[in-house]
From Swiss-Prot:
Residues 71-94, 125-139 have a biased composition (Acidic residues). GO terms for cellular component: nucleolus; nucleus; small-subunit processome. InterPro entries: Sas10/Utp3/C1D (IPR007146), Sas10_C_dom (IPR018972). One of its GO terms (biological process) is maturation of SSU-rRNA from tricistronic rRNA transcript (SSU-rRNA, 5.8S rRNA, LSU-rRNA). The modification Phosphoserine is found at S40, S133, S327, S340. This is Uncharacterized protein C3B8.09. PANTHER family: SOMETHING ABOUT SILENCING PROTEIN 10 (PTHR13237:SF8), SOMETHING ABOUT SILENCING PROTEIN 10-RELATED (PTHR13237). The keyword Nucleus applies.
Length: 597
């Protein structure tokens, strides 16, 4: 067998290689983790990723606050920049130190100022607390009073006399500035007045007048604009003299124009201070009155004047035929009733302005004036009312008694109409066969009584006797026509009743909107408003259940039970008696149908 070669030769050759020496300064630690080879940037992000479970609240707050610590170190370009950065850093540290001191002082003051407990500022309206009692309320009130007194003393200690002196000096400076401005403006106006001479052009004179009296041009334009309107209203008033709205507009506008003219007269006489003159107050009041009437429009028709005259004549003739001992109010009510009840003498009243809130619209019916009224003429009786009588009539219409009589009258008419048009009387039904036979028999009997006594009445055909076969048909058509005419008459009466109700509501609304037009008699008082009658003030509504916490919880529990019963089946106890079958939910005493009137 062959012997194995020894490796002594190779070891001897390898032992001849030199091993480099390792210096102490170049030694490094063993690399076991990622942190062993991390640089400064990696260390910063590792510190950010750590979660400190045992850290205090103060340390967490410091971490959340803004800091001046640099994230990544940047190399500076020169030594000068390093010096400037150090100076800026020192200044920032000083400023931040001052700010922290100021914040600490403010926090101390705020902590003392906001009280010792949060109960004083939260939960003041929570009355549902079961542990709440009157003793706690008194204790809270005492503590609140003590805290308020302490805060007041603390603030008064900081106030000094110099604060008040500074305010007084500042007020004095402001008043001096205002007086100086007023004196300067007055002096400037006086200088402009002194510069007036007859040689100045018209434009310069207008500038001086505008500086001294700025309201002059406005009043002049308004006067030139209102004069044509006054003439138009006067022309309308001549055409419609019974229109109360036109009379009020004419009075308001003429008063306003007269005050404007008086203003120009004072200015012409040399009155200097017109801004403080009492006429300015009167001008403002007249302008407001005119603007309140200016927006109102009245619907006037060309025939309203003629109808007004005819209505007055009819009122006079009916009033002359009434009893001597009747009072004026009763006469007025009787006149209205006689006119409204007479269908052939239906006369339209004077049209007035329609209210926007009332949406009912009626079609204007044609006026049917009886021609016999025109021919009526009593000897010695006037054809038109005198001015005094007309004023008395208008005054009666403005009184509350007139409206009360109208309300009673229209309520009586409404009740009569309800009785007449109740049920199915206004519904057209087909005539029954039996009723038609009875009606034809009555008509035949009436015709037989009107015929001669010697007429031949036998069983022969009427056509063979020369009597036309459509006689009954014509009579039937005439009856149908009369029936439908009666229905038309009833519908017109119902429409007339609706119009009267509409007029009544309109008059009441107009009287409530313009209470100044209602003249109160002796002993009458104006009614109070709804706010005064209720006397609620500004107190919010609070339910009575809040006063009793036990009752409030009980009601809340009952409400929750009802809500739960609507969502799922609730056991309500064992059924009483024997088995009566499944319940249908139909109740014998419950009626949900609508009863026809």
């Amino acid at each position: 067998m062959a012997r194995k070669k020894s490796r002594s030769s190779s070891t001897r050759k390898g032992s001849s290689l030199k091993v480099p020496e390792i210096k102490e300064k170049e030694k490094i630690n063993a690399i076991n983790t990622y942190e062993d080879v991390a640089n400064s940037e990696d260390e910063f992000y590792n510190a950010q990723d750590k979660i400190l479970f045992d850290a205090d609240n103060g340390e967490q707050a410091d971490e959340l606050e803004l800091s001046d610590e640099e994230l990544v170190a940047l190399e500076s370009s020169s030594d000068e920049e390093d010096g400037n950065a150090e100076e800026n850093l020192s200044e920032n540290e000083e400023l931040s130190g001052k700010k922290k001191d100021a914040v600490n002082e403010e926090e101390l003051y705020d902590n003392k100022g906001w009280g010792r407990s949060a109960k004083s500022y939260y939960g003041g309206d929570d009355y549902d607390n079961e542990d709440y009692s009157e003793e706690d309320d008194e204790f809270d009130a005492r503590m609140e009073e003590q805290e308020a007194l302490r805060l007041q003393r603390k603030r008064l200690e900081k106030v000094s006399e110099t604060d008040a002196i500074d305010d007084i000096s500042q007020w004095a400076d402001n008043s001096d500035l205002k007086s100086i401005k007023q004196d300067s403006s007055a002096a400037a106006i006086e200088e402009l007045v002194q510069q007036i001479s007859p040689d100045l052009p018209r434009t310069e004179l207008l500038k001086i007048l505008e500086a001294k009296h700025p309201e002059f041009q406005l009043f002049l334009d308004e006067l030139n604009q209102l004069k044509p309107q006054l003439n138009e209203i006067k022309e309308k008033l001549k055409t419609y003299p019974s229109s109360q709205l036109l009379q009020a507009q004419c009075t308001a506008l003429s008063t306003y124009i007269s005050f404007l003219t008086f203003y120009f007269a004072l200015l012409k006489d040399g009155e200097e201070d017109l801004k403080n003159h009492p006429i300015m107050v009167d001008l403002v009041r007249c302008k407001q009155t005119w603007e309140s009437y200016c927006g109102l429009d009245e619907v006037l028709t060309p025939t309203s004047l003629e109808e007004d005259g005819k209505t007055i004549e009819l009122h006079e003739k009916i009033a002359s035929a009434s009893d001597i001992g009747a009072s004026e109010d009763e006469e007025d009510v009787d006149m209205h009733e006689s006119i409204s009840d007479n269908e052939n003498e239906g006369i339209k009243d004077i049209p007035v302005a329609e209210d926007d809130d009332i949406t009912l619209k009626f079609r204007a019916a044609k006026s049917k004036i009886n021609t016999n009224i025109k021919n009526l003429d009593d000897y010695g009786e006037g054809n038109r009312l005198d001015d005094v009588d007309a004023e008395d009539k208008i005054a009666r219409k403005r009184s509350l008694k007139f409206y009360a009589n109208q309300i009673d009258q229209k309520a009586a008419k409404r009740s009569r109409a309800v009785l007449e048009l109740s049920g199915d009387l206004d519904m057209p039904y087909k005539e029954r066969r039996f009723e038609r036979q009875q009606r034809l028999m009555r008509e035949a009997a009436a015709r037989g009584r009107n015929q001669d006594a010697g007429a031949d009445l036998d069983d022969e055909d009427p056509e063979s006797m020369g009597i036309p076969a459509n006689v009954d048909r014509e009579v039937e058509d005439q009856d149908d026509l009369d029936y439908y005419e009666s229905l038309d008459k009833k519908s017109k009466m119902a429409k007339k009743l609706r119009k009267e109700n509409h007029d009544l509501e309109r008059d009441l609304i107009r009287a409530s909107r313009h209470p100044e037009l209602i003249e109160l008699g002796e002993g009458d008082k104006r009614g109070i408003t709804l706010d005064i009658a209720k006397n609620r003030g500004l107190t919010p509504r609070r339910p009575k259940e809040n006063r009793n916490p036990r009752l409030k919880k009980r009601m809340r529990y009952e409400k929750a039970k009802k809500k739960l019963a609507s969502k799922k089946a609730i056991y309500k106890g064992a059924p009483q008696g024997g088995y009566a079958g499944e319940q249908t939910g139909i109740k014998a005493g419950l009626v949900k149908s609508i009863k026809l009137q």
